[in-house]
Amino acid sequence: MPVALEISDGVARLRLNRPEASNGMNVELLKTLHEAVLAIHADPAARVVLLTGEGRNFCAGGDVKTFEAKGEKLPDYLREATAWLQLATAALIQLKAPVVTAVQGFAAGGGGLGLVCSSDLVVAGRSAKFFSGAVRVGMAPDGGSSVTLTQLVGLRQALRILLTNPTLTAEEALQIGLVTEVVDDDELTEHAESLAADLAALPADALSATKRLVWSGVGQSVEQRLAEEARTVSELSGTPDALEGLRAVIERRVPRFSR
């Protein structure tokens, strides 16, 4: 299964499970992720969620090999993938249970960055890296990152990250408020598990109410802004520049965008 879910001791352990593809997101993974989040929502035993990625990287974003294989059907596939990613990230925010995410390696693209931004607490390994990259391949940010990233780091930092596409270190991510804390790589799993266990021991209703109050107090509803983001991504997904950007990634070359 591309996503694994196990609930015990009040903690729902949700794991992206495509390590051979750096947990790159395709429609199958995104559908399964959304279904898993809905299962967590329906299970009162899940008081806290611990989100992780199997292997060296948390999530490398979209699965570019799958995208290339779609050929002329790529725009439709990207629209479908974006829709499922939007559903998954929105469902994480809407969960009553707080979401703790542990990041190792790369959290990239709308998938990786979107999941980080939809989490409540994020623990990063010291060597972790964060990267958007959408503009570099002729696309707009997705996964809710145009909404939630701005809420987390502010307008100026969000524009810098999304327009200039820097690769942020874990320490840089901590300084701007993208992650909650940074720990040594070999302590990441244990620390994230401990944090989740500590939260699971607290009153579930108080955790849920606090999460709801914070997320609902950040201005225009996430749902409204996600809808606008999805529309923009859909418009760009079939453009020549978007297709050229993807081909350039596959062929490991500099893209030749139209001017």
Model-identified regions with their sequence ranges:
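Conserved CoA-thioester-binding segment of acyl-CoA-metabolizing enzymes
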Residues: 1-54, 90
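Glycine-rich beta-to-alpha active-site loop
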Residues: 88-137, 167
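Well-ordered beta-strand positions
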Residues: 120-121, 160, 164-166, 172, ...
